[in-house]
Amino acid sequence: MNDWTALTVTTTTEAIEAVSNILMEAGAVGIQIKDAADFQKETVDAHGTWFDPKTVPHLASGAQVIGYFDPATSLVEQRDHIATRVRGLAQFGLDPGAATVTLADVRQADWANVWKQYYHPLRVSRFLTIVPKWEHYTPQQAGELQLTLDPGMAFGTGTHPTTQLMLSLLESVIRGGETMIDVGTGSGILAIAAERLGVGDILATDVDEIAVRNAEANIKLNPVSHITVTANDLLKGITLSADLIVANILAEVLVPLIPQVRPRLKAHGHFLLAGIIADKATLIIRTLEDNGFSIAQRREAGGWVALDAVIKETA
């Protein structure tokens, strides 16, 4: 008997995280991402060599998101529904690409090794390098910080522009000792990075119980001890006040989150937002301004926007 059923969605780079979320909601116990954009150059900008893409099999264009399901899951019936949801991403400003959905059986041994073909140490910012848990890595410069992740567990593994934009913003605002709330933590990468950069106590939340367990597992792989992970719907019911609030989620979810942030953000704090496709940036900025925020920083990469918002100063 085969151990897993793999459901593959052919899509675009910009839709990867949204498609990953669709598959997790459908019951996927693991997500694999193949993105041609990760293999377009031999080096990662100014941060040094990553690896030579010619030595690794990869897609020539586009992206694939592969969800791994228990074989008892009735995917034949779900396949059309998943395809419809993926095509529906167009109404949110995301290009779903071909949006084709295929099924295949995969044995446990194959699944356990497949991540190692596509995931290698990746320098993602000035100080941060993401390393898969099976690889030994030696820092290349003083002050470099390693984030150890299991990429077979959830999306948010650092290869997507939204994650890298958020990590660079974190580096720019953290001074040390802050309190932070990470809304929609996913793999826990932002919370882990924040503590490694000097943040004190961190509350990481996600509406998905599977994501909560995945974040907890990734946290155990790193030298961090001040992160609490809990299942929660955005900031509903949370009374903690924080110096930093971060959210790397789709614009459609950021809109209802923004009014919840203002009462929870301390004076002179920072609200960092990512997951914003470029043509949704105006909507998000307007919503922020309507709720008493101003934009301190704006960063862009690969058609995505990240923002650093602060509470407007009163005269």
Swiss-Prot record:
Keyword Lipid metabolism appears in the UniProt entry: no
Key word Transit peptide present: no
GO molecular function: protein-lysine N-methyltransferase activity
Biological process terms in GO annotation: methylation
Binding site for S-adenosyl-L-methionine: T163, G184, D206, N248
The entry's keywords: Cytoplasm, Methyltransferase, S-adenosyl-L-methionine, Transferase
Pfam families attached to this UniProt entry: PrmA
Domain of life: Bacteria
Listed InterPro entries: Ribosomal_L11_MeTrfase_PrmA, Ribosomal_PrmA_MeTrfase, SAM-dependent_MTases_sf
NCBIfam families assigned to the protein according to its UniProt record, in alphabetical order: prmA (TIGR00406)
Protein name: Ribosomal protein L11 methyltransferase
